[in-house]
Amino acid sequence: MNDLDWIYENLREAGLVQNQNDLSHLCGMDDSYISSRKAKGKEPSLEAMAHLAFNLEAELQALEDTIRYGEDLTADRLVAASIIYDVKNHIFADLKAKCRGGRHE
């Protein structure tokens, strides 16, 4: 399983995406972006991955706000938050490594 498949499967498990179009939108791109990149054997751009990471951060912030305002999260939402957190950190680590390695797209 490549990185993109891992990200997709985890975000699907967390309930954030239902299909590749949803993931494309979270990356700030058109519907077919993810399927097109996969078909061409290319990784998503740094811009798309940064956009995705910041959208995941916003999702986590919304969950934190829910808790802050006194609402309890269900066990499923807590698991989803943990998955989203892991995916976000994975993406940021990958972006950092690519930028340090000079692999800008």
Regions from the PLM with identified roles:
Residues M1-G15:
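A short, Lys/Arg-rich alpha-helix, primarily the initiator
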Residues A14-V17, E43:
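Residues at alpha-helix boundaries and the short loops/turns that link adjacent helices
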Residues Q20:
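Helix-turn-helix DNA-binding elements, focusing on the entry/boundary residues of the two helices
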Residues L23-S24:
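Short alpha-helical "recognition helix" segments of helix-turn-helix
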Residues G28-S45:
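Recognition helix of helix-turn-helix/homeodomain-like DNA-binding domains
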Residues P44-E59:
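Short Lys/Arg-enriched helix C-cap and helix-to-coil transition segments
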Residues A58-T66:
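N-terminal core-binding DNA-recognition domain of tyrosine recombinases/integrases
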Residues D65-E105:
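Helix-turn-helix/homeodomain-like alpha-helical modules used for DNA recognition
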